[in-house]
């Protein structure tokens, strides 16, 4: 029996697809692929040059044109004979020179040699190929032997390189690092050790943690250890892959992102002012200077700091602390009104609430001066300062608080003007009640590009009521103090 490769290939019509069939008919004609094997796996355009395309020649990889089979009409027997003779010649050339990697039938030769060597006979090899076929006429699946897996695994990195090339022109040099980076994410994330605590804390500071910005220092200071323990795994995950990821991203991509983010410069400055206002609001709400406990130590300090009412200023530590805190708050709000974010309606609303807190502090400071505890404290100071009556103490405290209200009046006047400007850019509630939703949406989003006020969340009636309450609160406090001075 003749087991020569060329003879068997020529008898089967130049293809291995018809060899296992008992009919021997050329039902599914076969031919070489127009695209080489490397370009076909990479899903890229091939120049179709033979014996080696330009892409494979540039990369230095073997260029192989494998046999393909496509269902269709039967070919003309004369053309099939010509195709068979051409396949036989090319196959014989590949057998005579097995080291020629540019041969067209090199891949087919390896499969046939593996089939004959593993089976030991033609019939066994045909049976092995027959098991991979179906009776429905579907294309044959080529079997992969054990030694073929190593070759495919070795060439996998070369086939994946064109898929990564569009990301960056310099990314192909780092392809092995990119392929090996998957091992870093396969293992479970372990808690960070003590050596990485400094890096983790730096990463947490660079992140946008809203809770750390909104809460005051004394509130989130006690929970710093708990927050660090909860955020440690995520920080460790990002720090482990940050160096490799940043090295793989092109500089042009990063520069474009930075340029696009620079368009939000005005929005970020407005956000910074709003964050400062929220911080002031949290501190004003958390620390109440007007209701500090009346301890013996504070009582002695108050007695030592008091002065005689007649012809001298009288300031207790309670009033002094209240005045200093309110002055700092008013100064901070005044600086915000001079900034570029002075037309932000959210900032104006937050500043209005802070002004209400400041007025409440002055009211409580004036009320504490005539409370029972403070009166007892002043009674203890009588041996030192002489006969001090309660009316004199009330009058002195009321005059001090009344003298500080001009600072609040200036701030309220400026804040009221800003609220009036925001109301002019906001639709009226009465007119909007008769309009449709589409009309309202069009009116909200047709503001000029230069307008920095975001009035989509507050109506004109809300801003007007806020302005009215600010002026009314200041007038009520002044009126109460003046009426108390008239009664004394």
Swiss-Prot record:
Regions of compositional bias (Polar residues) in chain numbering: 9-25
Pfam families: AflR, Zn_clus
Induction: Expression correlates with the formation of the sclerotia and thus the pigment production.
Keyword DNA repair in record: no
Matches recorded under SUPFAM superfamilies: Zn2/Cys6 DNA-binding domain
Single biological process term from Gene Ontology: aflatoxin biosynthetic process
Function according to Swiss-Prot or TrEMBL: Transcription factor; part of the gene cluster responsible for the typical purple-black color of the ergot sclerotia. The ergochrome gene cluster produces several ergot pigments including the yellow ergochrome secalonic acid and its derivatives, as well as the red anthraquinones endocrocin and clavorubin.
Protein name as it appears in the record: Ergochrome gene cluster transcriptional regulator CPUR_05433
